[in-house]
């Protein structure tokens, strides 16, 4: 799993990635087996109104208790890329499929809330 961040300073970028990875590792049914923070790079004009920023990447090897947990991580931690190494074949029962679909439905509802001028915030 690769996660990227863009920040206004090198320290802010690194800190944001470290906090994001820390929170991911605290999720139930998730274990981070390996983490590799890549060198933060200076980026010129990443956006029209920003002169410079810093791009950071962390590569993670993550173990999850089931596929539903992996989908949860993708939806809530927004990795740039995912590679499933094992198992070679995945089968899920109806209950797990339903959980995954409900997670997707919840995400869609959050997007709808954003497009109507509101934002749904997790206060935890």
Language model regions located:
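Long, contiguous binding/interaction regions
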Residues: 1-124
């Amino acid at each position: 799993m690769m996660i990227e961040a863009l920040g206004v300073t090198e320290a802010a970028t690194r800190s944001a990635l470290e906090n994001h990875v820390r929170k991911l590792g605290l999720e139930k049914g998730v274990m981070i087996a390996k983490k590799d923070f890549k060198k933060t790079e200076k980026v010129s004009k990443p956006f029209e109104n920003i002169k410079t920023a810093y791009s950071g990447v962390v590569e993670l090897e993550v173990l999850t208790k089931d596929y539903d947990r992996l989908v949860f991580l993708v939806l809530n931690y927004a990795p740039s890329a995912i590679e499933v190494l094992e198992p070679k074949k995945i089968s899920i029962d109806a209950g797990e499929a339903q959980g995954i679909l409900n997670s997707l439905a919840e995400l869609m509802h959050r997007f709808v809330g954003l497009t109507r001028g509101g934002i749904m915030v997790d206060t935890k």
